[in-house]
Amino acid sequence: MDPLRAQQLAAELEVEMMADMYNRMTSACHRKCVPPHYKEAELSKGESVCLDRCVSKYLDIHERMGKKLTELSMQDEELMKRAQQSSGPV
């Protein structure tokens, strides 16, 4: 696969993953913070605060997980390089 096509696929996958994360966050926070039977057309103060906190926590955890996965991936790459260097030419 040529590098340009690989880059396009990676970008498409990233957009798809972000859309999925947004949809899951929206659904989870809506279920948690907004009752199924609306009493008013507008969000109440409590609902609004709940949604704000829920989204904030969701994004914070998403960022932390991304950093940890990047860290683990870099460690794996380093271990692979060391293993290749120690095995030497075959």
UniProtKB/Swiss-Prot annotation:
One of its GO terms (molecular function) is protein-folding chaperone binding. A motif (Twin CX3C motif) lies at residues 29-54. It is a peripheral membrane protein. The keyword ATP-binding does not apply. It is found in: Mitochondrion inner membrane. Keywords: Chaperone, Disulfide bond, Membrane, Metal-binding, Mitochondrion, Mitochondrion inner membrane, Protein transport, Translocation, Transport, Zinc. Pfam families: zf-Tim10_DDP. One of its GO terms (biological process) is protein insertion into mitochondrial inner membrane. Belongs to the small Tim family. Mitochondrial intermembrane chaperone that participates in the import and insertion of multi-pass transmembrane proteins into the mitochondrial inner membrane. May also be required for the transfer of beta-barrel precursors from the TOM complex to the sorting and assembly machinery (SAM complex) of the outer membrane. Acts as a chaperone-like protein that protects the hydrophobic precursors from aggregation and guide them through the mitochondrial intermembrane space. Heterohexamer; composed of 3 copies of TIMM9 and 3 copies of TIMM10/TIM10A, named soluble 70 kDa complex. The complex forms a 6-bladed alpha-propeller structure and associates with the TIMM22 component of the TIM22 complex. Interacts with multi-pass transmembrane proteins in transit. Also forms a complex composed of TIMM9, TIMM10/TIM10A and FXC1/TIM10B. This is Mitochondrial import inner membrane translocase subunit Tim10.
